[in-house]
Amino acid sequence: MNKNRMKSLKEDYKHFAFTLLAVSTFLYIGAVLPDQGLTLGQKSTMFLADCVFLAGAFFCADRSLIYKKRLEEADE
């Protein structure tokens, strides 16, 4: 894999991680705010979706770090 492709993947995964983290933050705030008229099932669904988005953010951040290390190894 060439350096430009790895650099592009590193940046893409970093952007995905930040986007997923932002979405999960808004979902968490929406689930935690009181008196929104949400049922227990809806809150549970929002917390589950929040966990999925956080897991995706951690996965993307990890992939970004992997490509960063590969780029550093390729430079040596």
From Swiss-Prot:
It is a multi-pass membrane protein. InterPro entries: YrhC-like. The keyword Membrane applies. The chain crosses the membrane at residues 16-33, 45-61. One of its GO terms (cellular component) is plasma membrane. Keywords: Cell membrane, Membrane, Transmembrane, Transmembrane helix. Pfam families: YrhC. It is found in: Cell membrane. This is Uncharacterized protein YrhC. It comes from Bacillus subtilis (strain 168). The lineage of its organism: Bacteria, Bacillati, Bacillota, Bacilli, Bacillales. The gene is yrhC.
